């Protein structure tokens, strides 16, 4: 983090922020405390149902058109909770899931496509 912060274009704006704790508690609190927040890249790596549903409920509405939402364990039997949360909150007929040719394990979609 310290190295990444060295190349900030605007020294007064943090590029990264780590929030430690239970995601089911910290994500809703973080969103409430930061009403200005927009998310251009939402990378979901929880594997389990509860934290995935929490992040989708609270952060997905903050992803604008053109923003990217990515999952690392989508449609994997071992981590079915991530897929269950995805299917519960998102209309799979309206989302065009994509994969990287260099990393087929990551699924993503672009908001508004």
Indicate residue ranges for each PLM-predicted region:
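S-adenosylmethionine/decaboxylated-SAM
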Residues: 1-113
């Amino acid at each position: 983090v310290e190295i990444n912060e060295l190349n900030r274009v605007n020294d007064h704006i943090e590029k990264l922020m780590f929030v430690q704790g239970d995601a089911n508690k910290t994500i809703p609190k973080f969103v409430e405390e930061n009403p200005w927040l927009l998310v251009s890249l939402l990378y979901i790596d929880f594997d389990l149902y509860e934290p995935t549903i929490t992040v989708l409920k609270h952060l997905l509405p903050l992803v604008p058109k053109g923003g990217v939402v990515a999952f690392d364990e989508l449609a994997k039997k071992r981590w079915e909770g991530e897929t269950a949360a995805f299917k519960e909150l998102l209309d799979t007929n309206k989302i065009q899931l994509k994969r990287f040719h260099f990393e087929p394990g990551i699924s993503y979609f672009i908001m508004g496509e």
